[in-house]
Amino acid sequence: MSKQSLSYKDAGVDINAGNTLVERIKSDVKRTTRPEVIGGLGGFGALCALPSKYKDPILVSGTDGVGTKLRLAIDLKKHDTIGVDLVAMCVNDLVVQGAEPLFFLDYYATGKLDVDVAADVIKGIADGCVQAGCALVGGETAEMPGMYHTGDYDLAGFCVGVVEKSEIIDGSNVKAGDALLALASSGPHSNGYSLIRKVIEVSGIDPTTTQLAEHSFAEQVLAPTKIYVKPVLQLIKHTDVHAICHLTGGGFWENIPRVLPSSVKAVINEKSWEWHPIFKWLQEQGNIDRYEMYRTFNCGVGMIIALPQEDVETALALLQQVGEKAWVIGKIEHANADEEKVVIC
């Protein structure tokens, strides 16, 4: 009796599906390209030259995911914007140090490859790369039977940028008297989603039918993370930016001290900006205390920028020109070593 001849497909890995996906995404990848990119998809490694305008270039790298926002995206079958979130979480961390993102790579892992879903996700990644001005130069699609539940997938992103060595922003120039400028967020971005999902569970709502501020809750909670690269690079060009804080996991309490010298503190007026409606809903439905809100969520603020008071008017005008909502939310003050680095009052 002859034995059955087994194939990789019999084991759950469909190489043809992977090849189909590559063909599907080529046009999306192409629209992200930069002049520095050498070659196209299909190589073992991606090649990229440094932009010639840099005299003493320093590479800046970052990697991130989208946390359990992905669980909601999968459950609500909304796959076309989660890739924007993935890019945003990486490139926003790079621009904090003054870096221009150059190229991006993604990792997409699943138990059984659904070409349509994967193509939607990668289209979103390409959209994010276009917004950030970086090239999608490659990635890995891993089909791993037995590793994920049916329909589930996971994402990771990797980005490299470049900054002139003399123009690195590291917070060392922050001084008492600097103004704190806040850039509005589009919602929770990609942080706090385990708590969001718990509040949804406790409240018993249906995200697809519940309305919140003239939009469905699902639209609000899955709104893609804002990509601040282009407006922030313009601010850096036209004002004297001393520090930039990307409000991610840990919120205000954890992230702001990362960009401040030990001799100062950030004093923030919580009445100076608008909370996005979803945060008010979360606080009410989850009975979440004030400290926890500021520790878990961005509460309507995606980035905070420290700069001299004399540059505030220029910065606000520039941001208005490019359609970014911004507020002056506080200032930098002297602090003793044992004082809290963030005061919200």
Curated annotation (Swiss-Prot):
Location(s), subcellular: Cytoplasm
Pathway assigned to this chain's UniProt record: Purine metabolism; IMP biosynthesis via de novo pathway; 5-amino-1-(5-phospho-D-ribosyl)imidazole from N(2)-formyl-N(1)-(5-phospho-D-ribosyl)glycinamide: step 2/2
GO MF annotation, one: phosphoribosylamine-glycine ligase activity
Catalysis performed (reactions): 2-formamido-N(1)-(5-O-phospho-beta-D-ribosyl)acetamidine + ATP = 5-amino-1-(5-phospho-beta-D-ribosyl)imidazole + ADP + phosphate + H(+)
InterPro entries reported for this sequence: PurM-like_C_dom (IPR010918), PurM-like_C_sf (IPR036676), PurM-like_N (IPR016188), PurM-like_N_sf (IPR036921), PurM_cligase (IPR004733)
Enzyme Commission number(s): 6.3.3.1
Stored SUPFAM superfamilies: PurM C-terminal domain-like (SSF56042), PurM N-terminal domain-like (SSF55326)
Keyword vocabulary terms for this entry: ATP-binding, Cytoplasm, Ligase, Nucleotide-binding, Purine biosynthesis
GO BP of this protein: 'de novo' IMP biosynthetic process; adenine biosynthetic process
Pfam name, any one: AIRS
NCBIfam families: purM
Family: Belongs to the AIR synthase family.
The protein's name: Phosphoribosylformylglycinamidine cyclo-ligase
Annotated organism of origin: Histophilus somni (strain 129Pt) (Haemophilus somnus)
Lineage: Bacteria, Pseudomonadati, Pseudomonadota, Gammaproteobacteria, Pasteurellales
